[in-house]
Amino acid sequence: MCIKRKKTWIAFLAVVCSFCLTGCLKEGGDSNSEKFIVGTNATYPPFEFVDKRGEVVGFDIDLAREISNKLGKTLDVREFSFDALILNLKQHRIDAVITGMSITPSRLKEILMIPYYGEEIKHLVLVFKGENKHPLPLTQYRSVAVQTGTYQEAYLQSLSEVHIRSFDSTLEVLMEVMHGKSPVAVLEPSIAQVVLKDFPALSTATIDLPEDQWVLGYGIGVASDRPALALKIEAAVQEIRKEGVLAELEQKWGLNN
């Protein structure tokens, strides 16, 4: 395990232990349920999306299935808008959020997050049509397309004088640029790496993030008052990683580059 990933695991365990020590092991919800209920937002390929058969598939869904097997439960995937996921998690309507959710300081104040994919994200990807070796500052574009509820949307919202157009799915964001409605879009690097293969007319450039805006990869969200469940999921992820299954899933979904 690399040093950065180890630091992320240590940070997670420290947070969970702090909850345990303050008596938060008394968890709400039905811990004896035979189902592992996972909330997702199926608009973020290859992590989760709806295939041609109308089924929710992707890297996260396969991982959720592996975790449910480790927990001895049946997987139950439920779709929500991205903005509603954390609320439903806190209300124990779902056991976990697995939806390509970035680990950020603001989210760590609300929920527990178990790292499972990626390391520090130090830049975002600017997407535009045609060739442009010297992109303009974001404030110079008439609008910037981005997906609702994502870290990149939150980052853009923190910048003054950037006109943002937010959409529910990555596909809508890219079509906004393809049709010339917004001159540029901003994507997370691993998403851009996969989805842009189907959009050869689009080009990219990088947007460096200030150090205090770096993201610690992707995490599985668990309600902060359910640390025992978080530890079980964390142990399952560790086993899945050690067995090589996580690497196989990354390869299957084109996330191992």
UniProtKB/Swiss-Prot annotation:
- The superkingdom listed in its UniProt entry is Bacteria
The GO cellular component terms are: cell surface; extracellular region; outer membrane-bounded periplasmic space
Signal peptide range equals 1-23
Alphabetically sorted, this entry's keywords are: Amino-acid transport, Secreted, Signal, Transport
Give the binding site residues for L-arginine.
N41, E48, G100, S102, R107, Y151
Q: Which GO terms describe its molecular function?
A: amino acid binding
Where would you find this protein in the cell? Secreted; Cell surface
Chief place of localization: secreted
Q: Has the keyword Translocase been applied to this entry?
A: no
The record's InterPro entries line, in alphabetical order, gives:
ArtJ_PBP2 (IPR037297), Solute-binding_3/MltF_N (IPR001638)
Q: Which Pfam families match?
A: SBP_bac_3
Single Gene Ontology BP annotation: amino acid transport
Anything else the record notes?
Does not induce neutralizing antibodies.
Q: What is known of its domains?
A: Contains two domains, D1 and D2, which are both exposed on the surface and bind to epithelial cells.
Described function: Probably part of an ABC transporter complex involved in arginine transport. Binds arginine. Interacts with host epithelial cells, suggesting a role in host-cell adhesion during infection.
Q: Which family does it belong to?
A: Belongs to the bacterial solute-binding protein 3 family.
Q: What is this protein called?
A: Probable ABC transporter arginine-binding protein ArtJ
Q: Record the organism.
A: Chlamydia trachomatis serovar D (strain ATCC VR-885 / DSM 19411 / UW-3/Cx)
